[in-house]
Amino acid sequence: LGDVYKRQVYTSRDAAHKRIKQLIDEGGELPFEIDGATIYYAGPTGTKEGMAIGSCGPTTSGRMDPYAPLLLDMGLSAMIGKGERKPAVVDAIKRNGAVYFCAIGGAGALACQCITECEVIAFEDLGCESVKKLTFDKFPLIVAIDAVGGNIFETGRKQYAEV
């Protein structure tokens, strides 16, 4: 069960989301084209020689829930993180035909082996929380919430409650 992802994604965590929201509120230009984009909730560690990136595991997605519906309504197509999402986020995923993927928590050192490029594109002063453009190649993910609202957190609980 699961999928692999091959495309460009953008990292963004709490502090970067706050700044992105501020840019939206002020009518400023976002650091990347949000329409069709994928955001990976991660704050990679420093890069070792010969590697594109350091450890890069997912951050708890719920911390970005206050921002997710707005970004989804602006065209964000996918989010990657770990953990459940609030009902408002699930509704926005369905409304916009988006998807939420879960990455494997605690496996950041393995995840970095599936990232071939990394470039800081915004908020460099935030360090590991800066916005980075990453290129994923065979990055392992699980579809957690699909475009029609299928939700593994709900179906999983229901399935095991029946056992």
Indicate where each model-derived feature is located.
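Short, small-residue-biased leader/transition segments that mark boundaries at the very start
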Residues: L1-Y5
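Feature captures the catalytic cores and cofactor-binding loops of soluble hydro-lyases/lyases
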Residues: Y10-F139
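Active-site/ligand-binding-proximal alpha/beta "capping" segment
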Residues: A68, A144-V163
